[in-house]
Amino acid sequence: MRMTAAVVTAFSCAFLSLAPAKAQIVAKYSGIQPIDHPSSYSEKYFGEEVGLLTKGAIKVEVYHNTQLGDAVANVQSVRNGTIGFSTVSASNLNQVVPAMDMYSLPFLFKNEAHFWWFLSTPEAAALAKPLEDKGIKILGYLDSGSRNFFTQKAIRTPDDLKGQKIRVMASPVMVNTMKALGATGVPVAWAELYTALQTGVVDGAENNHPSVVAKKFYEVSKFYTLDEHMRIPDMLIMSMKLWNQLSDEQKKAVADAGQRMQAYMRGAWKISETKDLQALKSNFTEIVTPDKAPFVKAVSGLVQEEGKRLGVEKTIAFILDSQKNF
């Protein structure tokens, strides 16, 4: 019996409608900051952009405030593919590629403009490239401002740091920096820092304006010292296991979303940093603005020593030489 063209067409359409649709990819994004921190705003923005640019083919579920783990755990979770994305400090990546701890060196960048200029160079890209062989892809650099001390006693000179226990990230460079300044660097998980300050496990810590305000560290410390001793980038990292599952079109969309997040975060950070400095002035006993020269002098030898240990002497020389242009 001969089928009519209409019947054939109807049959074909019915058959095609039964073909399984390609499953949506769902990936988790793990952040460590509270919901009202600029990092959290930018993470939410990234998720929205990925959904938009992939037309819903990829859904990013965003978790904040260490819900899925702290920064150290997030690095490993990205590597093994348990989570797809995270925002981590470059310092946190030293556990995978030790050279990334170069970013923790004190007074490495002359100012914000110098910092962002370097991140756009081939030298910065070369520093990050080995991470891919370790299961991590960098999609963008995220602003995290300059780092300053918040303590129980006023820090006006390096001498004031002698004997002080200062919380740092799990970074050998940061521990050695505190030693050069006369203090003891004590690695403490971010989620545990408030209690550590409250109970005297540490005498102080260091971080940027928005992070100090978001976690209300002014409730458990009295003085904030604007020494700007470090400027360490946060990074948007992605699991290479997830990356390798994507089509070329999807890879481009996710990479574009990462660059959009980088730009968005710079704007959000500027707004938050200005606002939060006023909050710090209102809540700390005193905002100390020290002469930076003694701090720079105290750590000058450390920069070269750590550069040699990390195998990044040429990169450090490149950065230090470029300071004159800023």
Predicted regions and their residues:
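N-terminal secretory/targeting leader peptides
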Residues: 22-114, 122-326
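Bacterial N-terminal signal peptides
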Residues: 6-17
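Positively charged n-region of N-terminal signal peptides that target proteins for export
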Residues: 1-5
